[in-house]
Amino acid sequence: MTQKRLTEAEKEQLRAKYNPEGSLLRNDQMELLAMLDAVADICKQHNIEWWLSSGTLLGAARHDGFIPWDDDVDIVMLKRDYKRLKRILLNLDSEEFVFHCAESDVEYVNTFGKFRKRQGRVRVASRRYDYYRWRGVGLDIFAIER
């Protein structure tokens, strides 16, 4: 099965329909890019290899950026590197960012970690977020076995 490449006009139509410049979603995506840059810098400093994953990888390949309606970033790394990064991020002295996981928030139930802004805002109301210590957009970090 071959994937049809979208033309620039098709990409722009999708962006305009689902995600115009200045929209809340587009602003969140720009915030996520800054967060990805921060994590990429930390990984580079500590020789941690990572890859784009899931919808983020699909968006990069198909849309040359985000899938227009995507509201998170997904990365993956080997489990041993995830454990190292988790230690680093849990000890990160940052006023801006936090690593959200079970160790930093007893109410957090996901099996993966989220790199978040400390002062993030919630766009989607959900009871599961009511108990979270930190909210808002996040960069999902997954671990895989070799």
Where are the model-predicted features located?
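Conserved catalytic core of two-metal-ion nucleotidyltransferases
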Residues: 12, 16-44, 89-146
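Generic secretory/membrane-interface signal
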Residues: 4, 66-68, 108, 134
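Active-site nucleotide-donor binding segment shared across nucleotidyl transfer reactions
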Residues: 40-73, 82
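Short hydrophobic/aromatic beta-strand micro-patches
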Residues: 76-78
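Conserved SAM-binding loop
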Residues: 85
